[in-house]
Structure formats: structure tokens, C-alpha cells
């Protein structure tokens, strides 16, 4: 009788657990250093104090809830900027890239395992 619970536990371990997450990259494609870079997504945010020209910032997060994304940053002349990105759903998984350029940021969301 002890074998059945043990076998069930091993079966669950073998099947593995998978948690949906977003692998995000913020890229500074401007000629100047950006400061106070923040990405807002449903239920949380992340960011970095500075992002040098040509530098990338990587962050991995889990989406809890649903809603839009946005990015805020301050340029070298101390002007604040905001750009709205794609909406995310709680089950979303994939990569999110934001390339900040001298004109406008470019957002790319590539979902995987979309249900």
C-alpha cells in the first residue's frame, strides 16, 4: 500500500511543473544614457536606475492578472517619457522586448504556448 502514494509522487515529479513567465529585455537605442527606467505590467513593475546607450536590461517576471504594459524613462535632458505597450494576460508566456529609440519605443511581444 505504501507503493501507491510513492508512485503517485514520483509520477508528479516526472511530469514536472511549468510556470508561465515573460522574459523581458529593455534596450537603449538612443545616443545618451537614460535614467529611472521603469516597466509597469499587470500587478507589478521593474526597472533600473540607469541604462547606458547601447545597453540592454533583462528581467524575468510572472504575470498576475491582466492589463496593459507601459514604460517610463527620463532622457539626458531630464524630460520624462511614457509609452504604452501590449496588454498581457495571466496565462501569457514568451518574450517582451522594448527598444527605446530617439523617436519612439518599439514593443515586441512574442507569446509561446498560447492557450
Predicted regions and their residues:
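Post-signal-peptide N-terminal segment of Sec-exported extracytoplasmic proteins
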Residues: 36-82, 108-110
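Bacterial N-terminal signal peptides
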Residues: 5-15
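Extracellular beta-sheet/turn segments enriched in Thr/Pro/Gly and aliphatic residues
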Residues: 80, 86-115
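Short loop/turn positions at the edges of beta-strands in beta-sheet-rich folds
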Residues: 30, 63-65, 92
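Bacterial signal peptide processing site
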Residues: 16-20
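Intrinsic-disorder/low-complexity, polar/charged segments enriched in Ser/Thr/Lys/Arg/Asp/Glu/Gln
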Residues: 21-23, 56-58, 95
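Asparagine-centered strand-capping/turn motif at beta-strand->loop junctions
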Residues: 24-31
